[in-house]
Amino acid sequence: AGVAFKELSPEETRKIEFALNPDTSFHSAVHLPNDEVGNCRQVALMIKSEAQRIGVNFSFNTCVKQINTSNGSGVDIGVYGENSPRPFDAAVMCAGLESTRFLEPLGVKIPMAAVHGYSVSATIREPLNAPRSAVMDEHYKITISRLGNRVRVAGSTELGGSLQNKRSAAFRTLYKTLNDWFPGASNLSNGAQEWKGALTMLPDGAPVLGASGVRGLWLNLAHGTSGWALSCGSARVMADLI
């Protein structure tokens, strides 16, 4: 795919990430020199601000009741607390797992499953003990990233479950992995932020992009663990199709 990479020995790896725990052994590492780390939430807020600047109107905290085809070529979206539906020429369904309850009454069935992931974010205690960029532990499938003056550890994905049920074992694995590779890097005892989030996937892992089969309704769903990486490209595809 044209992605530059190089296999490194432990000695070579420690020259790039010199804060790696010397007591944690590993066979080798794969270095992706062009990879970068970013704050997904911050980027989303910046995109929102830019969209508003060029005239996009957002309706936050609006609870959608149902979606129906209109008498014309678009769709009508019913909103709780409003007597009349809102008409649109086109609508894009991108509501994650909640999309199924809107699509099934329209005859559109997509075999999406919920996958939940965990993360811990904490301030850096000693910059020299923190990662320079990002490290992925392939054994536990956990990523350790540096975001300015914070460290974020993310992974421990699970199929199914609910957002309300936060497994302590999943967080223990995150803390263990951080301590394995970067002990003493962050203030875990003072305000560490624990998070659990949901995403959707199809059995084959590829997202659903394009027409739904319902006039005026388009789909942008099930990006799995690559949601941020695929977001701008998916938006470009949707804009071109619509």
What are these regions (language model features)?
Residues 31-48, 97-98, 170-177, 223, ...:
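Mid-domain beta-loop-alpha active-site segment that forms a flexible
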